[in-house]
Structure formats: structure tokens, C-alpha cells
Amino acid sequence: MAPALRSLLSPRTLLLLLLSLALLGARAEPATGSAVPAQSRPCVDCHAFEFMQRALQDLRKTAYSLDARTETLLLQAERRALCACWPAGR
């Protein structure tokens, strides 16, 4: 066997590998008794729905505000264009 392969298969390395696997396996087990019953958990869907309702209301307000601002700017532009057509002496 090659020296590098022999050092990988040494009893010390194998023991360390087995201990690491055992510790990782023990940590991955779920804790017993820590489950929260469904009745006492917050309704995630309800909270998400309320959040989306508020976000939609905010978007509607923003859209209305932008629409009103656009209308104002268009009226100002039309007024400027109309006033530019009239001679200053009239």
C-alpha cells in the first residue's frame, strides 16, 4: 500500500471518522417534545394574506398619486404649448 493511503486507513483516522459521523447523526435527530401544536401556531397564510392586502392598498395609493401627478404635468405642458402659440402683443 502507498504511504498516503496507509495513513488514511490508520486506526486513529478511522476512529476519528466514526466519532464524527456519530456526533453528526446525534445532532441531526429531532428533539422530542418540542413540536408546537397546530392550534397554537400563527396562521402563516392569514398573515401573508394581510400583508399582501396592505401592499396592494399601498400600490393603489401610489398608482393614484402617480396618475394624478401625470395628469397635472400633462395639463401644464398643454398650457405652455398653448400659451407659446399666442403672440405676446395681443
UniProtKB/Swiss-Prot annotation:
Q: Is Ribonucleoprotein set as a keyword in this record?
A: no
Signal peptide position in this chain?
A: 1-28
- What organism is listed for this UniProt entry? Mus musculus
Tissues expressing this chain: Expression is enriched in both male and female reproductive organs, including the testis, epididymis, seminal vesicles, coagulating glands, ovary and uterus, and in various non-reproductive organs such as brain, thymus and liver. In testis, expressed in both germ cells and Sertoli cells. Also expressed at low levels in the kidney. Expressed during neocortex and cerebellum development.
| Keywords, comma-separated and alphabetical | Cytoplasm, RNA-binding, Secreted, Signal
This one is known as NELL2-interacting cell ontogeny regulator 1
One GO term of the biological process aspect? spermatogenesis
Which InterPro entries does UniProt cross-reference here? NICOL (IPR028147)
Q: What does this protein do?
A: mRNA-binding protein which interacts with a range of target mRNAs including SERPINE1, ACTA2, CCN2 and COL4A1 and may promote extracellular matrix production. Binds to the 3'-UTR of SERPINE1 mRNA and stabilizes the mRNA, possibly by competing for binding with SERBP1 and preventing SERBP1-mediated mRNA degradation. Also binds to the 3'-UTR of ACTA2. Testis-derived lumicrine factor that triggers epididymal differentiation and sperm maturation.
According to its UniProt record, what is one Pfam family this protein matches? Neuropep_like
